[in-house]
Amino acid sequence: MQTIEQQITNVIEESLTDMGFELVLVKFKGVNPKVVEILIDSLNGEKISVEDCTKASRTISAILDVEDLIEDAYSLEVASSGLERPLVKFENYNRFLGREVKIKLKELLNGKTRYQGKIIKAKNNKIYLKCEEQEVLIDYDLIKNANLVLTEEVFKKLLKQ
């Protein structure tokens, strides 16, 4: 059985894609009222604006009202996934080749559960990282969570835009 987050993903993802957005993450936070937090990114690499979040929010809200997946009262928050966005799909690793990433694993790999390094390659359900002077091969299924890292190099590129 699918979680409510997966059900929401299923009903909104295509519409967001049609609007030029990637659905990054759906999660619940808070209790009374619940908050449905939805993180989006641009498919073309552009920055996400407040207007983008507003447009996406209106579309998502209309879909959720029709689908009626959430029983209790809730509020909807749509936001940019940010500079240190989570990587939640295998395809994300190919999109961000060469970028620095922090990865937390579900279990030990070479005596560690945390790795930070540049994404060298993502192929056959494996992530190849350059960590300091060594290459680390991580099975995608071992990843608990991963986020991009805001490095000085990325920051300088942003300042030039």
UniProtKB/Swiss-Prot annotation:
GO cellular component, one term: cytosol
Record's keyword terms, sorted: Cytoplasm, Ribosome biogenesis
Record GO biological process: ribosomal small subunit assembly; translation
Disulfide cysteine pairs (residue numbers): none
Annotated family: Belongs to the RimP family.
Location in the cell: Cytoplasm
Keyword Cytoplasm tagged: yes
Protein name: Ribosome maturation factor RimP
UniProt source species: Rickettsia felis (strain ATCC VR-1525 / URRWXCal2) (Rickettsia azadi)
Chief site of localization: cytoplasm
InterPro entries documented for this protein: Ribosome_maturation_RimP, RimP_C, RimP_C_sf, RimP_N, RimP_N_sf
Annotated function: Required for maturation of 30S ribosomal subunits.
